[in-house]
């Protein structure tokens, strides 16, 4: 799920709305991942509260934030490595890296109106994480950023 998982202004109970949004994947027992959108906090939960709820749901691969990043802006910044097919030469190897970054909600800079953006702490985490992965797997695997 790629952000704006609920419509905050109509969500009188954000947790209930999130449960409904992810119910099809949960019922089908499909592993899934989510990242926050700029409106997810407009209901009854804060941005952190929304992500805390998401990471407790069944079959989610979502993470609150990377454990090694003690100071990082936003909630739900993480990466997932997709491994190759069992029985292939790529089994147990990272063939695709998915990066999930919280771009925030609204600008906190008065001179810049509109929506938020990826912050330097997140850029640094991305650079460090992708560099470690490149060294570990000793080649450039593909990556996608959400």
Regions found by a protein language model. Name each.
Residues 1-6, 37, 141-146:
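Active-site beta-strand/loop signature of hydrolases that rely on acidic residues for catalysis
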Residues 1-16, 20:
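N-terminal active-site segment of His-dependent metallophosphoesterases
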Residues 17-140:
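Extended active-site neighborhood of metal-dependent phosphoesterases/phosphodiesterases
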């Amino acid at each position: 799920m790629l952000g704006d998982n609920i419509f905050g202004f109509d969500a009188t109970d954000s947790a209930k709305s999130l449960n409904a949004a992810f119910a099809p994947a949960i019922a089908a027992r499909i592993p899934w991942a989510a990242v926050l959108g700029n409106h997810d906090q407009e209901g009854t939960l804060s941005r952190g509260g929304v992500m805390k709820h998401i990471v407790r749901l069944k079959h989610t691969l979502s993470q609150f934030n990377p454990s090694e990043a003690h100071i990082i802006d936003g909630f739900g910044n993480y990466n997932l490595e997709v491994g190759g097919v069992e029985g292939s030469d790529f089994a147990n190897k990272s063939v695709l890296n998915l990066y999930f970054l919280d771009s925030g909600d609204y600008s906190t800079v008065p001179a810049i109106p509109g929506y938020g953006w990826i912050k330097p702490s997140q850029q640094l985490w991305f650079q460090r994480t992708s560099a470690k992965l490149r060294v570990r797997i000793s080649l450039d695997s593909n990556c996608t950023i959400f």
